[in-house]
Design a protein with these regions (language model features):
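Short secondary-structure boundary/capping segments
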Residues: 42-43, 67-68, 306-310, 334-337, ...
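Conserved H-loop
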Residues: 295-299
Length: 400
């Protein structure tokens, strides 16, 4: 885990050097797409399959179809839960979130169950089209095209799970039903674009292959536009789950042939992985590891609540690069037996390192240019502003 304020050079000093070590596969959160532009070509020369999954410019992205990884009703429910994101819905009454979940469950299940839907048509665009068919018109239930489609599916398969889920919602009064439909449409309006429809029409990523061959997946996310957060969260949730299932069911010793490391920048802001507090405790045995990048520990608590403590405890290494949150500074001060004032005013370009079983120590941050020179790697093609060393004369001696 890496904790540091904006501008602490977390990407330059931690993510980039680890990425360029070229050990195993990587799944990297890439705000603005800079990492892909800087290092994509280099990784190709090192034998990597390089994948650009862009939620900023979906028209330039490889295709990703979440429904391609759904085969059970449990996976359907997980997909719906991530997309609805009950914890951040803002609904005081759980009835509305539960209704949205059941409706979305029924739509996804219909696409997977219906014999008239071709495999190539099993995508998110088909779900949105079904949602548009749910209007009842003049408040008459039988006027709903979706209702009739569900009835037809029930005639074909009396045990249809899609039909059962839909009936749970369809039994609502007309006014309530229409509100559920309108709320669901509004929730997914930001995803209803031609570019996303093209990107999600089929799947080119092949998640399992990430654990089979050296692959670098750059997940481009916006640090200002949060409209794609649900899809981003879904991708990370599905990727971790699929790799764990593959390791458990098909790999020797339940370990991936190629280790996979996730670099999750701005983790607590745009990524809320389903059951991550449980997952992080178990993924290590499958040769899956995670580097979480945060601005503060309180930021993690805001997203994960009490589960944040479990996540922190399961990280063997903590790199603290300094920030302005007094609560986080106090927590770090207790760990290294320093005052909160000392931690809040630690020198620029230094970090405290905490490793399980070792005494904490302070060190100077790695300079990326020195690392590139040592490894004889061509410097970044993207020009950057000169970073002047501030307060260099005040940096304390390194502790060993």
């Amino acid at each position: 885990m890496v904790v540091g304020t904006t501008g602490a050079a977390k990407t330059r000093t931690v993510i980039t050097p680890n990425l360029l070590e070229c050990v195993g596969s990587y799944v990297v959160t890439d705000p603005k797409g800079n990492l892909y532009c800087q290092w994509g070509d280099y990784l190709k020369t090192q034998g990597y399959r390089v994948v650009r999954l862009s939620f900023i410019h979906p028209e330039k992205s490889v295709h990703y179809n979440p429904l391609n990884y759904v085969t059970t009703t449990q996976q359907i429910q997980q997909l719906s839960s991530v997309l609805i994101n009950k914890n951040k819905s803002g609904h005081a009454d759980p009835f509305w979130d539960d209704s949205l979940l059941m409706l979305l469950n029924s739509l996804i299940a219909y696409v997977k169950e219906c014999p008239g839907v071709l495999p190539a048509e099993e995508n998110f665009h088909a779900i949105l089209e079904l949602l548009r068919m749910a209007g009842r018109g003049n408040s008459i239930r039988k006027d709903s095209v979706l209702s009739q489609a569900m009835e037809n599916l029930h005639e074909y398969n009396e045990k249809s799970w899609a039909y059962k889920q839909f009936q749970n919602v369809n039994q609502s009064p007309d006014k309530t039903f229409n509100t559920i439909i309108a709320t669901t449409i509004a929730k997914f309006c930001s995803m209803d674009t031609d570019e996303l429809a093209e990107m999600m029409q089929d799947d080119e990523i092949d998640i399992i292959s990430i654990g089979q061959q050296k692959t670098a997946v750059f997940v481009e996310v916006s640090d200002s536009d949060r409209s794609m957060d649900a899809l981003i969260n879904l991708f990370f949730t599905q990727t971790m789950n699929q790799l764990c299932i593959y390791a458990d069911e098909e790999c020797e010793n339940n370990q991936l042939p190629v280790p996979v490391r996730f670099f999750m920048d701005d983790f607590a802001t745009n990524c809320k992985i389903e059951n991550f507090e449980n997952m992080i405790s178990n993924i290590r045995s499958r040769k899956i590891s995670v580097i979480l990048i945060l601005q503060s520990l309180s930021q993690l608590e805001n997203s994960y609540g009490q589960s944040a403590h479990t996540i922190v405890d399961d990280c063997d290494t903590l790199i603290y690069m300094g920030e302005n949150d007094p609560e986080t500074a106090h927590s770090i001060a207790v760990r290294c037996n320093k005052t909160t004032h000392t931690i809040l005013h630690m020198p620029i370009c230094t970090s405290w390192i905490f490793r399980r079983g070792e005494k904490p120590f302070m060190c100077r941050n790695m300079e990326l240019d020195d690392y590139l020179q040592e490894k004889k790697i061509i410097s970044s093609p993207i020009k950057r502003k000169h970073r002047k060393e501030i307060w260099e004369q005040d940096i304390i001696p390194l502790c060993s």
